[in-house]
């Protein structure tokens, strides 16, 4: 099927090493489990069944791998400083990009990794930013007739996003990232998260691995992933993601949508049949199109692919060869 991990041939000439979840779990070695069941429950998103067993199977090995990349980056930084005779300068943050479809579990992965990586001695300060804050405000999207394209590449203020990442990788202190409200479904005016020289910055969003056409005139323009030191893609079959998205929408009708301030409050009081029809329409007309056109094509650019089965748990890991 197009859009599945089988697109990559698991042979000696594949750009990836492939591991089952059981094989991957062995790379944990003696990495201690530092999260409790209550912490995992707090960190996971609605309808995401991740538990301590999944953290043991997948995320401890992943945090160990990422920590070794961070330590290697720090060692290279020190060696380069000696080579350049630069003296005492601060290392810029190690940036991890996390991409994948809506409802696939990017946010849970990002939050779990943030907690685990912050407990490694090489990276005590870990921050997390999502691309949601870099969406254009709804007022702009309506004016440009882009509300039905929200989440597509053109709905983001790419200039602001690139300026943010450029400042982070330049080592600037107190870099501001705009904040987003999932309640109001809009960017919060004049509200920011301040990122102050962390050891690691996790940058999560559906299209963070997207490339772009070369501009006319040959002018060099960076892309978001140019600023990443490591990238992760969360993968699953279309049918699974479809079911997760619709189930999440229906469950939100009983929770967040009931808030009078919710952008989606109108869906809380309609019939279940009508709500299901709306969820299916949103999936078919917006999210599935974005997945096929803009998200899945970025998957081969990831350093690591975490592939989920129908139960929302990871069953295969693909790690790019060095």
From Swiss-Prot:
Source organism superkingdom: Bacteria
CDD domains: PanK
Reaction(s) this enzyme catalyzes, per UniProt: (R)-pantothenate + ATP = (R)-4'-phosphopantothenate + ADP + H(+)
UniProt subcellular location: Cytoplasm
Gene that produces this protein: coaA
Key words of the record: ATP-binding, Coenzyme A biosynthesis, Cytoplasm, Kinase, Nucleotide-binding, Transferase
Lineage: Bacteria, Pseudomonadati, Pseudomonadota, Alphaproteobacteria, Hyphomicrobiales
Presence of the UniProt keyword rRNA-binding in the record: no
Family per record: Belongs to the prokaryotic pantothenate kinase family.
Keyword set includes Cytoplasm: yes
Membrane-spanning intervals of the chain: none
Pathway(s) where this gene product acts: Cofactor biosynthesis; coenzyme A biosynthesis; CoA from (R)-pantothenate: step 1/5
GO MF assignments: ATP binding; pantothenate kinase activity
Gene Ontology BP terms: coenzyme A biosynthetic process
Name of the protein this chain belongs to: Pantothenate kinase
Pfam families in alphabetical order: PRK
EC number from the UniProt entry: 2.7.1.33
GO cellular component: cytoplasm
Binding site for ATP: 100-107
């Amino acid at each position: 099927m197009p859009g599945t991990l089988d697109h990559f041939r698991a042979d000696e000439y594949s750009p990836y090493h492939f591991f089952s979840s059981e094989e991957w779990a062995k790379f944990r070695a003696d990495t201690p489990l530092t999260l409790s069941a209550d912490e995992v429950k707090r960190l996971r998103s609605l309808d995401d069944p991740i538990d301590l067993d999944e953290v043991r199977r997948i995320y401890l090995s992943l945090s160990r791998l990422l920590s070794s990349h961070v330590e290697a980056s720090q060692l290279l930084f020190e060696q380069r400083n000696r080579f350049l005779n630069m003296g005492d300068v601060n290392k810029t943050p190690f940036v991890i990009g996390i991409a994948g479809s809506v409802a696939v579990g990017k946010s849970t992965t990002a939050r779990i990794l943030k907690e685990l990586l912050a407990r490694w001695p090489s990276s005590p300060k870990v921050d997390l930013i999502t691309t949601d804050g870099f969406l254009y405000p709804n007022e702009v999207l309506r004016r440009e007739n882009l509300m039905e394209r929200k989440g597509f590449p053109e709905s983001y203020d790419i200039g602001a996003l690139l300026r943010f990442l450029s400042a982070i990788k330049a080592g600037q202190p107190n870099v501001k990232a705009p904040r987003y409200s999932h309640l109001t479904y809009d960017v919060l005016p004049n509200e920011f998260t301040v990122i102050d020289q962390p050891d690691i910055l996790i940058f999560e969003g559906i299209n963070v691995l997207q490339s772009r056409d070369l501009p006319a005139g040959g002018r060099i323009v960076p892309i978001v992933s140019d600023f990443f030191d490591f990238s992760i893609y969360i993968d699953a079959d279309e049918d699974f993601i479809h079911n997760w998205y619709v189930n999440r929408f229906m469950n939100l009708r009983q929770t967040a949508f009931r808030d009078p301030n919710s952008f989606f409050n109108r869906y809380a009081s309609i019939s279940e049949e009508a709500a299901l029809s709306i969820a299916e329409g949103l999936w078919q007309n917006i999210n599935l199109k974005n997945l096929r056109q803009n998200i899945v094509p970025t998957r081969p650019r990831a350093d690591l692919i975490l592939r989920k089965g129908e139960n929302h748990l990871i069953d295969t890991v693909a790690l790019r060869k060095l």
